[in-house]
């Protein structure tokens, strides 16, 4: 192997190592910024209060279809057997009693139950939007339709899957010794498969953001692994330490259930943070990084791209924006898009593409400066992509803005106070 090839290989390895280290730092910063443990604690409390209304909706949907009515108990047993610690299994009896007493609920009680469910679903959506750095939530009607669709179709698909599995495993193929072993293996694998599929769907549907499958799959895999570790840890603790029963007595199921829900949310949110980080991370060489304080340069370039797209009658999606402007990070791009949307300078169409909503010839720079609150840098710095048409236009605008500031800011601070009352002549 020639020295040139060896040198090229080492350069590739160093670049990959730098990319890996950069992604690790980026992922850690996202974990800290997302404050996932606090978010999981909040969701755990709201989820506990939403268990009864959620069960009412789920089993109410099944009751509306006689074909699925016989699978209600089987679905409940499957959920509590595979996804709830044994010490909290008594919660199943409480839910069953609540469902039996459903006819005794008053209108006010039903309104309170539905409100608690909607609050929980709204909190979940807000948390996922925060993880994916989405500032604008869905319209209320759209949000309600998505909630209802997920709950109803998800319930029907779960019951249909159990019915189909029961039919398949009843075939003569699974009556043999090998077939019984295969069926038993499939039933053991089913909880993890259900977890994985549900989490992937949550990542794809809940955020007001286009989450690609290649990002959702690793995040869901991490979440499932963490949840299986939590299950194993719970099994070890509950099987060897019974102190919690002596402390809480008959109420021991409640703290166990609350802790279980909290750790489950931690697992799901950590997986979501990984998925969003994989989508947002972009390895930028030093020469392609936007210097701190020069965000206005990126903003002017971005508006130039939208102006050009409008001339051609096109919109820009977020992937296209990042491809055209490699100096923008995903976080900065989301912030700029959110601010421009708030100014009603941009709008989003039904395909998720961003479009100019106003003529830039009628938008003064002062409006951008006041609303976006970006500083005008005084000193000149090497800027990425400065030599193309957009870079030249943005750099020229910055130079015009900074020229009058330089002379004003060059004067000493003490000169501002030369004419105060009481100063010596």
Swiss-Prot record:
Superkingdom in the source lineage: Bacteria
Q: Which residues form a coiled coil?
A: none
Q: Which GO terms describe its cellular component?
A: plasma membrane
Q: Does the keyword Acyltransferase apply?
A: no
Q: What are the TM regions of this chain, as residue ranges?
A: 48-68, 105-125, 154-174, 182-202, 219-239, 250-270
Location(s) in or outside the cell: Cell inner membrane
Cross-referenced InterPro entries: UPF0761_bac (IPR023679), Virul_fac_BrkB (IPR017039)
Q: Under what name is this protein listed?
A: UPF0761 membrane protein XOO3615
Q: What is the lineage of its organism?
A: Bacteria, Pseudomonadati, Pseudomonadota, Gammaproteobacteria, Lysobacterales
